[in-house]
Each structure stands twice: as C-alpha cells, then as structure tokens.
C-alpha cells in the first residue's frame, strides 16, 4: 500500500499522477476524480473520521489534534474495499497528514510519500484558491502540518519529494520510484509536465 500526502497546494495530485503512470492502482475509474483521489475513501472514511472529532472535513480549520483521533475498527478492510483489487494500490489525500497514526496502525507495511513545496508558494496558492477559505493564517496552517511531518518522518516508512524539483528534473522522482518498488519512467514524467501551467498557475498543485 502506498499513501501520498502533504500540505494541500503542494502538488500531491501531480505526484500521484506520476505514480499512476508508473503502474500504481488508485481504484475503479468511477471512484477516482481528476485530482487522482479515490472519492469513496475520501468521503466515507477520511471525512467521516474528521467529522467524528469535530475537525474540518476539508482539513482547513480547525485541525484535529493527534491525541484526539478515535479508534476506527475495520479501517484497513474499509479502505481496501473501496480501492478494489489492483497492483501497487495507492491512495492520495492531503488530509492523511492529519490522521496518519490511524492509517499507520491499519497498514503497518505501507510506503508513504510526503510531497513538499516551498511554504510561501503554498500560502500564495491557498490565498488564490476559491475553496481555501476557512483559515485566517495560512502560514500557521503550514507550520501545523510541518510539525506533523516531523513525527511522520520518525514513525513511517517515508520518502519526501519536492514537486518543483520533479518539475525541473524528472530524475528527482527516482527516490519515490525506488521507495515504492517502481521502475523509473523518465519519459512518462516528461510527458506529464506542463512547465507553463506549473509556473503560471496551480494546476498541478491543486491538493
């Protein structure tokens, strides 16, 4: 199992797209949206957990404390049921950063991909994005995520990847491919990168 997460607006969708190109399975086509999210897992599991503890289901404000996470029996079975059967299953959701201990316990063998982006670029992207409206201080919001990243590094089988680095140099994805047991497809990465869109807007950084 592969989990992809990071701050929203970091490029998690782009990195997940690359994982799909490398052969990862995201679920039945009718359950996966244009952001490479398995909507069934997101709506029925991730958002349900957040709402159970009165946290924002969009992962904006308020954020949950890791100490408040509820027990969620059957989490592994539920996730796998919504994903279906496929080689190299993967699930991407920026909100996994807020719930990672639950998914670590349910999937102790999982490989994690932590997507990174410059803090100021994330803040600017949040301020330009119509649905990012609940938080008044995006800088503090990014800091809250980065505090969680520190614990994730210590407790998860995790690799970090900076989206801008992959945009500039496809070989920067090699650490992700190796970590996830995939053969690096440089040509596939090059064909997936639209440099004009990345620098002009947040098309690839939508979550």
Q: Can you name each region flagged by the protein language model?
A:
Residues 1-74, 195-201:
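PAPS-dependent sulfotransferase catalytic core
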Residues 40-42, 63-64, 124-130, 147-155, ...:
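Low-complexity, flexible helical/coil segments
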Residues 80-185:
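PAPS-dependent sulfotransferase catalytic domain
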Residues 58-91, 116:
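A basic- and aromatic-enriched beta-loop-alpha substructure that forms the phosphate/nucleotide-
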Residues 185-207:
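C-terminal accessory extensions appended to soluble enzyme cores
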Residues 44-48, 71-78, 137, 175, ...:
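Exposed alpha-helical structural elements
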Residues 15, 98, 122-123, 202, ...:
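A periodicity- and composition-biased signal for non-globular, repetitive helical segments
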Residues 27-31, 138, 180-192:
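Short, surface-exposed acidic
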């Amino acid at each position: 199992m592969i989990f992809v997460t990071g701050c929203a607006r970091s490029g998690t969708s782009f990195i997940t797209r690359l994982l799909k190109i490398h052969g990862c399975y995201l679920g039945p086509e009718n359950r996966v949206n244009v952001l490479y999210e398995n909507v069934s897992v997101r709506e029925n599991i991730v958002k349900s957990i957040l709402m159970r503890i009165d946290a924002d289901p969009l992962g904006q404000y308020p954020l949950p404390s890791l100490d408040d996470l509820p027990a969620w029996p059957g989490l592994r079975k539920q996730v796998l049921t919504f994903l279906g059967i496929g080689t190299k299953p993967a699930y991407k959701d920026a909100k996994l950063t807020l719930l990672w201990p639950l998914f670590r316990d349910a999937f102790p063998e999982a490989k994690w991909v932590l997507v990174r982006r410059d803090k100021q670029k994330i803040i600017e992207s949040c301020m330009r994005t119509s649905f990012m409206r609940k938080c008044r201080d995006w800088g503090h919001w990014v800091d809250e995520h980065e505090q969680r990243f520190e614990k994730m590094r210590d407790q998860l089988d995790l690799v970090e990847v900076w989206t801008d680095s992959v945009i500039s140099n496809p070989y920067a994805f090699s650490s992700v491919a190796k970590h996830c047991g995939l053969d690096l497809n440089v040509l596939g990465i090059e064909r997936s990168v639209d440099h004009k869109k990345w620098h002009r807007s947040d098309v690839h950084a939508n979550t």
